[in-house]
């Protein structure tokens, strides 16, 4: 019995020149996601996925490495300009934005979108070390 030969079409990567970089920086980790204007993810990277474990995940250097990895993958889509949306109280916010700028991505705007409660839920108790 002869096998049927199927011709497979190669998936062509779409070209996106303007993108949005979402940087979520918590006290423990930093997540960098680069999306198109509609919100479809092009690339993402985390400081934990970049090889940092434990308390080193929350460092500014780990956030810088994560932003560089996300920018490298986004460059394959032809991304040139990024709007940056920063969320969270972590230490990797500034270094992630600087890393995107250093990777030849033109940062057009930086917006802080950290959610602030209008006195909603009770916060966690203070740590006693």
From Swiss-Prot:
Pfam families: Ribosomal_S11. Keywords: Ribonucleoprotein, Ribosomal protein, RNA-binding, rRNA-binding. GO terms for molecular function: rRNA binding; structural constituent of ribosome. One of its GO terms (biological process) is translation. GO terms for cellular component: ribonucleoprotein complex; ribosome. Gene3D superfamilies: Ribosomal protein S11. It comes from the Bacteria. InterPro entries: Ribosomal_uS11, Ribosomal_uS11_bac-type, Ribosomal_uS11_CS, Ribosomal_uS11_sf. The keyword Ribonucleoprotein applies. Part of the 30S ribosomal subunit. Interacts with proteins S7 and S18. Binds to IF-3. Belongs to the universal ribosomal protein uS11 family. Located on the platform of the 30S subunit, it bridges several disparate RNA helices of the 16S rRNA. Forms part of the Shine-Dalgarno cleft in the 70S ribosome. HAMAP family: Ribosomal_uS11. This is Small ribosomal subunit protein uS11. The gene is rpsK.
């Amino acid at each position: 019995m002869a096998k049927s030969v199927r011709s497979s079409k190669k998936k062509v990567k779409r070209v996106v020149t303007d993108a949005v970089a979402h940087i979520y920086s918590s006290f423990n980790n930093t997540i960098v996601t680069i999306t198109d204007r509609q919100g479809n993810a092009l690339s993402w990277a985390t400081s934990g996925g970049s090889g940092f474990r434990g308390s080193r995940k929350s460092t500014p250097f780990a956030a810088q490495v994560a932003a560089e990895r996300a920018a490298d993958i986004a460059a394959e889509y032809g991304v040139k300009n990024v709007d940056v949306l920063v969320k969270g109280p972590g230490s990797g916010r500034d270094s992630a934005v600087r890393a995107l700028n250093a990777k030849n991505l033109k940062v057009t705007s930086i917006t802080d979108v950290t959610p602030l409660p209008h006195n909603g839920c009770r916060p966690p108790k203070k740590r006693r070390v």
